[in-house]
Amino acid sequence: MPRDYQAEKEKCKTFLQEFYKDDELGKKNFKYGVQLANIAHREQVALYIDLDDLAEEDPELVDAICENTRRYTNLFADAVQELLPQYKEREVVHKDALDVYIEHRLMMEQRGRDPSETRDPHNQYPPELMRRFELYFKAPSSSKARVVRDVKADSIGKLVTVRGIVTRVTEVKPMMVVATYTCDQCGAETYQPIQSPTFMPLIMCPSRECQTNRSGGRLYLQTRGSKFIKFQELKIQEHSDQVPVGNIPRCMSVYVRGENTRLAQPGDHVSITGVFLPMLRTGFRQVVQGLLSETYLESHRLVKMNKTEDDELGTEELSEEELRQITEEDFYEKLAASIAPEIYGHEDVKKALLLLLVGGVDNSPRGMKIRGNINICLMGDPGVAKSQLLSYIDRLAPRSQYTTGRGSSGVGLTAAVMKDPVTGEMTLEGGALVLADQGVCCIDEFDKMMDTDRTAIHEVMEQQTISIAKAGIMTTLNARCSILAAANPAYGRYNPKKTVEQNIQLPAALLSRFDLLWLIQDKPDRDNDLRLAQHITYVHQHSKQPPSQFQPLDMKLMRRYITMCKRKQPAIPESLADYLTAAYVEMRKEARTNKDMTFTSARTLLSILRLSTALARLRLEDVVEKEDVNEAMRLTEMSKDSLLGDKGQTSRTQRPADVIFSTIREMVPEKGARSVKYSEAEQRAVSKGFTPAQFEAALEEYEELNVWLVNQARTKITFV
């Protein structure tokens, strides 16, 4: 059924003038009337029409707009242009060149023209030239955001919302909307509205005077009288969770104009509402591929999803019921066990991965930046579910990138300088680490990477930036991501006869940047192997973890809780400073006496601080407590013990009582009193990974042997 577009325009005018909402005091608030007044006084440029507001008045008009967006954009713009004089109460103070130009032309025309004379159609001002505002539609809330691969031919010309990640951004350039020409013979002005990406400039003057005199006046382009608008091109790609397994992520070009430019950077997750349109190829490409057409999205509204309307994360507050479900007894163990519940065991590794997802607190004292992100390397024999843990973290993390060592080059991880096909300029295209900004980058087969490519990660792991000096582009990109790497030992399997360095064969500069380096060994053990085999066969039969009293948390709920934890900024109180420094000095002392220990540097202390703040965040606290520091030190000890394997000097293989005894003996000063504070000894034992019960048992055992005495108040341990 043909539409009467004049009547439709009247509907648009009525809506803009009459739509209102009641405020708290019951007064009518004319939402669009206020904005029209701002536009008339040049205080606002972009007018967003919210289709939810229009749906209250006229649902049929909303459907028509979604089906034929381009036409209705012009109808609304014409309606606004006609209404503006009613809202203009005063003269515009700050006028630009185009304002003066248009006013001058109108004045000249009124002076020099006979009232009875009709205006030359070529000299008429096109509406695009007179418009000093931009009009965009905001999609109705009922329309769901689509995936790039779901936008197909049936969406041509319609209003669609697409979600994706920005991979490339061009520079903002002025784009010509109306070309103005002046004739060198008669002085008449001619205007040429431009709708397509290319246009043919007019040469001969079409005015009546030149036609009757046959003077053949030539036209010259007047750039000051022409109208330009800001233009930028984006490339968006599907999110990793939207790509079916084994498929290549799809891309889409987005053309952004006016006030919507400069809103996104490479690596931003965005939701873009716009009109899906085709475009014939032009220039040289038309000769080669003349019958092919390209498609693009003409942007109306661009929203960064990781800042405001992040519907993917579901940032609505957790209800009290959900919070109670998470923060009940042993919630730390429960959250850790909810990570990859199909995988048997690895409790401490899962706890470390949970802390990696939450992250520590960033510090920037006087410009110097101390990172808060936690980096973890999982080293282990083949078949211990390292890659499964990585892929689960990739799915669970709100922002993540998954890549493998052999399949990634140094440029693919950091950033590539590409030649823009439209302008021929060099542009930056972010790599995996840039796209994982404020998220997690999982790198599998880390040991298979080329050494030259691996060096690209050094700067990211400590400074959290990527510095580039390529093809005349000198810049620094943010790469504030946690790195989770999985690697096999140098000989395929871990060889206990070799040292740690010989087995790992990664440079010390890289290893010290990992907060935790975890070795997962596959040792034969009858009871363990039996439980693992039963677990695997059950998972294989039923495609889920075996039934138990423990019910793992839903992935969406965990994601929301992690987002909630990240808002906390816990601080370390001064009372813990001495405790931390003493613990660090002790660790350095152990590293010096034990040659087979891994490298311990000042970064180890920073790692403990990061893990402590992550634990405080997990409890939704604003202050780090001693238990957090003890747990952080326990995880650090456990990761070091995992590297020492079956060696005789490892503390794990000795009896707990013997290790606790040697720990307390080391605390006794060489001269003076041969006693130790009970509380300090207990804290030291707990930080080494022992339970209070084991500590008590060790005290009693050695007291019976008459090695030391514990006083009645249990405040002091004195060596006999």
Curated annotation (Swiss-Prot):
Stated family: Belongs to the MCM family.
Disulfide cysteine pairs (residue numbers): none
Annotated InterPro entries: AAA+_ATPase (IPR003593), MCM (IPR031327), MCM7 (IPR008050), MCM_CS (IPR018525), MCM_dom (IPR001208), MCM_lid (IPR041562), MCM_N (IPR027925), MCM_OB (IPR033762)
A GO cellular component annotation in the UniProt record: CMG complex
Catalytic reactions on record: ATP + H2O = ADP + phosphate + H(+)
SMART domains: AAA, MCM
Subcellular location: Nucleus; Chromosome
Name of the gene this protein is made from: mcm7
Residue positions binding ATP 1: 344, 383, 385-387, 488
The EC number(s) this enzyme carries: 3.6.4.12
Highest taxon listed in the record's lineage: Eukaryota
A Pfam short name: MCM_lid
Zn-finger segments (C4-type): 183-210
Molecular functions (GO terms): ATP binding; ATP hydrolysis activity; DNA binding; DNA helicase activity; zinc ion binding
Function: Acts as a component of the mcm2-7 complex (mcm complex) which is the putative replicative helicase essential for 'once per cell cycle' DNA replication initiation and elongation in eukaryotic cells. The active ATPase sites in the mcm2-7 ring are formed through the interaction surfaces of two neighboring subunits such that a critical structure of a conserved arginine finger motif is provided in trans relative to the ATP-binding site of the Walker A box of the adjacent subunit. The six ATPase active sites, however, are likely to contribute differentially to the complex helicase activity.
Domain (MCM) ranges: 331-537
EC class (word): hydrolase
Protein name: DNA replication licensing factor mcm7
Keywords: ATP-binding, Cell cycle, Chromosome, DNA replication, DNA-binding, Helicase, Hydrolase, Metal-binding, Nucleotide-binding, Nucleus, Ubl conjugation, Zinc, Zinc-finger
Additional remarks: Early fractionation of eukaryotic MCM proteins yielded a variety of dimeric, trimeric and tetrameric complexes with unclear biological significance. Specifically a MCM467 subcomplex is shown to have in vitro helicase activity which is inhibited by the MCM2 subunit. The MCM2-7 hexamer is the proposed physiological active complex.
PTM (free text): Ubiquitinated by traip when forks converge following formation of DNA interstrand cross-links. Short ubiquitin chains on mcm7 promote recruitment of DNA glycosylase neil3. If the interstrand cross-link cannot be cleaved by neil3, the ubiquitin chains continue to grow on mcm7, promoting the unloading of the CMG helicase complex by the vcp/p97 ATPase.
Quaternary data: Component of the mcm2-7 complex (RLF-M). The complex forms a toroidal hexameric ring with the proposed subunit order mcm2-mcm6-mcm4-mcm7-mcm3-mcm5. The heterodimer of mmcm3/mcm5 interacts with mcm4, mmcm6, mcm7 and weakly with mcm2. The N-terminus is required for interaction with mmcm3, though this interaction may not be direct, and remains in a complex with mmcm3 throughout the cell cycle. Begins to associate with zmcm6 at the neurula stage. Component of the replisome complex. Component of the CMG helicase complex, composed of the mcm2-7 complex, the GINS complex and cdc45.
Binding site for ATP 2: 513, 603
GO biological process: cell cycle DNA replication; DNA replication initiation; regulation of DNA-templated DNA replication initiation
Chief localisation class: nucleus
Location of the motif Arginine finger: 512-515
